[in-house]
Amino acid sequence: MNPNTPADVYYGQMSQGSSMPVTTVPSHSHYASQQPPPLLQPGSTYAHQYGTPQYGYANALSSPASIPPSLPPSMNSMAGQSVLPLPGSGSMNPAVYASGGFDTTGQVAPPGMKPRVTATLWEDEGSLCFQVEARGICVARREDNAMINGTKLLNVAGMTRGRRDGILKSEKVRHVVKIGPMHLKGVWIPFERALDFANKEKITELLYPLFVHNIGALLYHPTNQSRTSQVMAAAEQRRKDSHGQLRGPPGLPSLQQHHHHHSMLPGPPSLPSHPSMGRPALDRAHTFPTPPTSASSVMGPMGNSDGYQWSQQSMSGTQGNSSLSLDTSLGSNARSMPSTPATTPPGSTIQSMQNYPPVSQSYESSRQMYQGQSAQQAQYQSQQHYSSQPQHQERPVYSQSSYIKNDMGPPSGRPTGQSNDASDSKPPTGMIHQGQGQSDPGTHAGSEEDDDANNEAEYTHDSGGYDANRGSYNYNTQAVNSLPHDHGLAPEIGGSPHQAGSGRATPRTAAAPSSYYSAQGYHTPPRGQPSSSLYNVMSNERTGSNGTQGNEMYAGQADMPSSLPNGYSAQPSVMNGSSGGLKRGRDDDDDGGRPTTSAPNLGPGMDMKRRKTMMDGGSLPSPTYTATIAQAAPSAIAAHRRR
C-alpha cells in the first residue's frame, strides 16, 4: 500500500472545499455511513466548523477563536513525510494518511507528534475503549458510540473542578459512570461536544489521536500488525465470550471486518437475549426445591417435568392446580406411606386421634360421661342405675358415694373386711371384686363370693368403667372435703375405721347420706392437695389394667393400695397422705403377691406391718388395712343400714 496516495486524496478532497451535513446523534452509525470510502470522508466531515466555532461555557467565558486557517499549508508541508519513524519502544506510530484533516478536528498529527493509543475492553459496558494519555491523564473514548470521558478531557485542560463540573452538568447528552477503573469514571459526553471542548481549551493536539475517526486503524499499522492484531483479537474474543457481541473496529478496510461491523449493529438487543436464555435455569433453581422439601415424603415419585411445572405454577401465582395435585397425591399415598406433621392433613390427624379410645370401651364411655356431664349429673345417673337393681332403698345413695369414691381410683382392701355382710359389702367391693378378688380369691369368704355372683357384674362394670377415668376427679373432691369436717381421727377412735381408712366407706360410717351430699358440695371441689395429686398420678397409671381387667396381679395391687393413702390422708394431715402414698409404693414392692389367708383373720405378719405403719402415722398398706376393715365392717354396715 503506497502511503502517499491517501495523502494526495485527502488534500484534493479538502481543496475542493466539499462539506457534508453534520450528524449530531453520537451513534456509531454516523461513522459507519462514512466508511464505504473509509479514508476519504473523515477529513471533510468537520471542515465546515472552522469558521464558526460558536462555543461558550456556562459562565459566559469564551475561549479564543479557532486555529487560523494557516494549518493546511503546514499539513501540506507534512505531506512530504511519508511515514513517521516508529519509536524503538514498539509503540504504534501510523503513517500520516491516518491523521488526515485539520488540526482542530484532531485528525492530523501535530509536527513530531507520536500518537500513543491503547485499547482495553471495558467489561462493565461491553465496549472497547481507546485511551490516549496527555499530561499524565488518561482520556478514554468508547469504540461503540465514540463517547469521550469529558471529566478527564477537561482535567487535561487544567480546568478547576467547579468550572469543569458546571460545564458537564449543562450537557444535555451525558453518561455518568461512578463504578469501574479510575480512568473510566466521570461524565461521558458525545464525540462532537468533546471535540468542541478540546478546541476551546486548545488541547486538541495534545489529545491526538483521540479524535481520529478511524482510530482503530492506528492499532492496525502494517509495521506493527502482529502485535496489534493479537491485542484486538483477544479483546474481541473476550467481548464475544462475555457479552455475545462481536463488533469489528470501525475503520478497518477489510471486507470481512466491514461485514461483521454491519451485521452486528443490532448487537445490543442480543445482550438481553443471552441472559434471557439463562433465566429459566435460574428460576427453576430458585423455585423448584420448595415444593419437594415440604411434600417429598408423601408426594411419591414425581418426574422432573412435573416438578418444574409445579414450580412454575407457584411462581405465576396459580396455586389452584398445584394444590390440587398435591392433595390428590396425599390422598393416594397416605395409605401406604407414613404421614408426617408437615404434610398430613388435619382432618386425617383428628380421625386417627379419635380412633384410639374405642379400643377400650369402658375408658371411652367413661371419658364421654366425664366430659359431657358434670360430676353431680353423673352421680344422680348412677343413683338411678343402682336404684333399678334389686337392692336396699338406701343402696342407691351409698352406691352413689361408693361409685364416686371408686371413681377416684381403684378401691382399697376395705371391702374384704365387709364381705362378711352380703348385702352391704357390694358397693365397696364392686371394684374390689374386680381387682383384689381376682388377684387374691382366698381373701374372700363364701358370702362374699355369693355377693360377687349377684352384683359384681352390674356394679363392677359401672364402677370399673367410671373408675378408670372419672374416679380421680370425684375422689379429689371427697378427700379434700373430708379434711375440714370432723372426720379426722374421730371415726377411727369411735370404732369406725372405714371412714378413716377408706374414702369409699365415709358416707356409711359418717353422717347421714343427706348431710354427706349437702355438707360436701360436689360443685366446687377444692383441688390443691398433694395426696390427691399423688393419688391421681398413681390411679391414672393403673386404671388401664383395672378397668380392662387385664392382669389380675397388678389389677389387685392397683385397687388395694391406691385408695389407702387417700383414705388415711384425711386422718393426720395432707402431708401424711402424700407420705402415705410413698409408703404405699414401698409396700407394693414388699407385697409381691397378696396374702392368701382369709380376710377376717390375717396372719401375724400382717398385724406387725399394720402396727408399724400406724405408729409411723402414714397410710396403712393394703393387707393391713384389709384386716382393719374386716374387724369393724359389721358394725359400720349395721349403722349405715339403721340410717
Curated annotation (Swiss-Prot):
Recorded phenotype for the gene knockout or disruption: Destroys the ability to make protoperithecia (female organs), but does not affect male-specific functions.
Region named Disordered: 1-37, 229-627
Signal peptide range in chain numbering: none
Biased composition (Low complexity): 336-349, 368-391
Chain positions covered by the region annotation Nuclear localization domain: 583-612
GO terms classed as biological process: conidium formation; sporulation resulting in formation of a cellular spore
Domain of life per record: Eukaryota
Positions of the DNA-binding region: 150-171
Induction note: Constitutively expressed during the mycelial, conidial, and perithecial stages of the life cycle.
One Gene Ontology cellular component: nucleus
Keywords: Conidiation, DNA-binding, Nucleus, Sporulation, Transcription, Transcription regulation
PROSITE patterns, per the entry: HTH_APSES (PS51299)
Protein name, entry field: Cell pattern formation-associated protein asm-1
